[in-house]
Protein backbone atom coordinates (compact mmCIF):
# COMPACT_ATOMS: atom_id res chain seq x y z
CA UNK A 1 0.00 0.00 0.00
CA UNK A 2 2.78 2.57 0.66
CA UNK A 3 3.84 2.14 -2.96
CA UNK A 4 0.31 2.96 -4.16
CA UNK A 5 0.13 6.00 -1.88
CA UNK A 6 3.43 7.23 -3.30
CA UNK A 7 2.18 6.77 -6.87
CA UNK A 8 -1.05 8.61 -6.04
CA UNK A 9 0.89 11.52 -4.51
CA UNK A 10 3.14 11.69 -7.57
CA UNK A 11 0.11 11.73 -9.85
CA UNK A 12 -1.57 14.47 -7.81
CA UNK A 13 1.56 16.64 -7.88
CA UNK A 14 1.75 16.27 -11.68
CA UNK A 15 -1.99 16.88 -12.17
CA UNK A 16 -3.15 19.61 -9.77
CA UNK A 17 -6.22 20.21 -11.95
CA UNK A 18 -7.64 16.90 -10.68
CA UNK A 19 -7.42 18.04 -7.06
CA UNK A 20 -10.27 20.27 -5.86
CA UNK A 21 -8.70 20.86 -2.44
CA UNK A 22 -6.68 23.97 -1.65
CA UNK A 23 -3.63 24.05 0.56
CA UNK A 24 -4.00 26.50 3.45
CA UNK A 25 -2.27 27.07 6.78
CA UNK A 26 -4.75 24.64 8.34
CA UNK A 27 -3.94 21.97 5.73
CA UNK A 28 -5.83 20.98 2.62
CA UNK A 29 -9.40 22.24 2.52
CA UNK A 30 -12.21 22.24 0.02
CA UNK A 31 -13.16 25.58 -1.50
CA UNK A 32 -16.49 27.01 -0.32
CA UNK A 33 -18.25 26.28 -3.62
CA UNK A 34 -17.11 22.63 -3.53
CA UNK A 35 -18.24 22.28 0.11
CA UNK A 36 -21.62 23.69 -0.90
CA UNK A 37 -21.91 21.20 -3.78
CA UNK A 38 -20.83 18.33 -1.53
CA UNK A 39 -23.37 19.29 1.13
CA UNK A 40 -26.15 19.57 -1.44
CA UNK A 41 -25.20 16.22 -2.96
CA UNK A 42 -25.07 14.42 0.41
CA UNK A 43 -28.45 15.83 1.44
CA UNK A 44 -29.86 14.81 -1.96
CA UNK A 45 -28.50 11.29 -1.50
CA UNK A 46 -30.21 11.06 1.89
CA UNK A 47 -33.50 12.27 0.45
CA UNK A 48 -33.30 9.83 -2.48
CA UNK A 49 -32.85 6.93 -0.10
CA UNK A 50 -35.55 8.14 2.30
CA UNK A 51 -38.02 8.46 -0.57
CA UNK A 52 -37.21 5.20 -2.32
CA UNK A 53 -37.05 3.18 0.87
CA UNK A 54 -40.27 4.76 2.11
CA UNK A 55 -42.06 3.65 -1.03
CA UNK A 56 -40.56 0.17 -1.07
CA UNK A 57 -41.19 -0.35 2.66
CA UNK A 58 -44.90 0.37 2.39
CA UNK A 59 -45.39 -1.03 -1.09
CA UNK A 60 -46.60 -4.46 0.04
CA UNK A 61 -49.24 -2.83 2.28
CA UNK A 62 -50.39 -0.67 -0.65
CA UNK A 63 -50.42 -3.64 -3.04
CA UNK A 64 -52.43 -5.74 -0.61
CA UNK A 65 -54.98 -3.05 0.31
CA UNK A 66 -55.41 -1.31 -3.05
CA UNK A 67 -54.65 -4.06 -5.57
CA UNK A 68 -55.70 -7.06 -3.49
CA UNK A 69 -52.32 -8.74 -4.00
CA UNK A 70 -50.71 -11.36 -1.83
CA UNK A 71 -47.29 -10.67 -0.33
CA UNK A 72 -45.69 -12.88 -2.97
CA UNK A 73 -47.35 -10.98 -5.81
CA UNK A 74 -46.24 -7.66 -4.31
CA UNK A 75 -42.69 -8.96 -4.00
CA UNK A 76 -42.76 -9.87 -7.68
CA UNK A 77 -43.23 -6.19 -8.51
CA UNK A 78 -40.27 -5.19 -6.34
CA UNK A 79 -38.18 -8.01 -7.79
CA UNK A 80 -38.89 -6.70 -11.29
CA UNK A 81 -37.71 -3.24 -10.18
CA UNK A 82 -34.54 -4.76 -8.73
CA UNK A 83 -34.00 -6.75 -11.92
CA UNK A 84 -34.42 -3.58 -13.96
CA UNK A 85 -31.76 -1.91 -11.83
CA UNK A 86 -29.34 -4.83 -12.14
CA UNK A 87 -29.74 -4.91 -15.92
CA UNK A 88 -29.20 -1.15 -16.07
CA UNK A 89 -26.09 -0.62 -13.92
CA UNK A 90 -23.45 -1.11 -16.61
CA UNK A 91 -25.36 0.60 -19.46
CA UNK A 92 -26.12 3.55 -17.17
CA UNK A 93 -22.42 3.91 -16.37
CA UNK A 94 -21.69 4.00 -20.09
CA UNK A 95 -24.41 6.56 -20.75
CA UNK A 96 -23.13 8.74 -17.89
CA UNK A 97 -19.64 8.70 -19.36
CA UNK A 98 -21.10 10.23 -22.53
CA UNK A 99 -23.67 12.70 -21.23
CA UNK A 100 -22.40 13.29 -17.69
CA UNK A 101 -23.30 12.06 -14.23
CA UNK A 102 -25.43 15.05 -13.31
CA UNK A 103 -27.65 14.72 -16.38
CA UNK A 104 -27.96 10.98 -15.80
CA UNK A 105 -29.01 11.52 -12.18
CA UNK A 106 -31.53 14.16 -13.26
CA UNK A 107 -32.90 11.74 -15.82
CA UNK A 108 -33.17 9.10 -13.08
CA UNK A 109 -35.00 11.37 -10.65
CA UNK A 110 -37.44 12.48 -13.33
CA UNK A 111 -38.01 8.91 -14.54
CA UNK A 112 -38.49 7.65 -10.98
CA UNK A 113 -41.01 10.37 -10.16
CA UNK A 114 -42.77 9.92 -13.48
CA UNK A 115 -42.94 6.14 -13.07
CA UNK A 116 -44.45 6.41 -9.59
CA UNK A 117 -46.96 9.01 -10.81
CA UNK A 118 -47.87 6.92 -13.87
CA UNK A 119 -48.36 3.82 -11.71
CA UNK A 120 -50.64 5.77 -9.39
CA UNK A 121 -52.67 7.20 -12.27
CA UNK A 122 -52.93 3.82 -14.03
CA UNK A 123 -54.18 2.30 -10.79
CA UNK A 124 -56.97 4.88 -10.70
CA UNK A 125 -57.85 4.59 -14.39
CA UNK A 126 -57.70 0.78 -14.48
CA UNK A 127 -59.32 0.44 -11.06
CA UNK A 128 -56.63 -1.91 -9.80
CA UNK A 129 -53.46 -3.68 -10.83
CA UNK A 130 -52.64 -4.39 -14.46
CA UNK A 131 -49.66 -6.35 -15.82
CA UNK A 132 -48.84 -3.18 -17.78
CA UNK A 133 -47.53 -1.85 -14.46
CA UNK A 134 -44.66 -4.35 -14.64
CA UNK A 135 -43.14 -2.13 -17.35
CA UNK A 136 -43.25 0.78 -14.92
CA UNK A 137 -41.47 -1.34 -12.30
CA UNK A 138 -38.70 -2.02 -14.83
CA UNK A 139 -38.46 1.74 -15.39
CA UNK A 140 -38.29 2.30 -11.62
CA UNK A 141 -35.27 -0.01 -11.55
CA UNK A 142 -33.66 1.83 -14.46
CA UNK A 143 -34.29 5.16 -12.73
CA UNK A 144 -32.89 3.97 -9.40
CA UNK A 145 -29.77 2.65 -11.16
CA UNK A 146 -29.34 6.03 -12.90
CA UNK A 147 -29.22 7.71 -9.52
CA UNK A 148 -27.16 5.15 -7.59
CA UNK A 149 -24.45 4.39 -10.14
CA UNK A 150 -23.52 8.05 -10.38
CA UNK A 151 -23.90 9.47 -6.89
CA UNK A 152 -20.87 7.82 -5.22
CA UNK A 153 -18.45 8.83 -8.02
CA UNK A 154 -19.75 12.41 -7.80
CA UNK A 155 -18.92 12.50 -4.08
CA UNK A 156 -15.51 10.88 -4.51
CA UNK A 157 -14.44 13.13 -7.39
CA UNK A 158 -14.56 16.10 -5.01
CA UNK A 159 -11.57 14.84 -3.02
CA UNK A 160 -7.92 14.08 -3.57
CA UNK A 161 -6.82 10.47 -3.87
CA UNK A 162 -5.72 10.10 -0.27
CA UNK A 163 -9.21 11.08 0.94
CA UNK A 164 -11.25 8.59 -1.10
CA UNK A 165 -11.95 6.48 1.99
CA UNK A 166 -13.12 9.51 3.96
CA UNK A 167 -15.46 10.68 1.21
CA UNK A 168 -16.74 7.14 0.61
CA UNK A 169 -17.52 7.07 4.33
CA UNK A 170 -19.47 10.33 3.97
CA UNK A 171 -21.47 8.84 1.11
CA UNK A 172 -22.33 5.70 3.06
CA UNK A 173 -23.13 7.65 6.23
CA UNK A 174 -25.68 9.76 4.38
CA UNK A 175 -27.13 6.93 2.30
CA UNK A 176 -27.33 4.28 5.01
CA UNK A 177 -28.62 6.59 7.75
CA UNK A 178 -31.51 7.41 5.43
CA UNK A 179 -32.58 3.78 5.36
Feature annotation, model-predicted:
Residues 146-160:
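Intracellular juxtamembrane helix-capping segments at the cytosolic ends
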Residues 98-111:
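Cytoplasmic membrane-interface "Motif A"-like loop-to-helix N-cap segments
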Residues 130-146:
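Hydrophobic core of transmembrane alpha-helices in multi-pass small-molecule transporters
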Residues 111-128:
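C-terminal ends and interior cores of transmembrane alpha-helices
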Residues 2-43:
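Juxtamembrane intracellular "pre-TM" segments in multi-pass secondary transporters
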Amino acid sequence: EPELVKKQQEYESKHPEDNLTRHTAQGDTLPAEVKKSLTFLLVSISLWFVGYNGVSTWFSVYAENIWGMSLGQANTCLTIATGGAILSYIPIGTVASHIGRRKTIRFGTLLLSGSFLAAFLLTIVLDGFSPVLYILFLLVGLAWASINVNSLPMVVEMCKGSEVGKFTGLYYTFSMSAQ
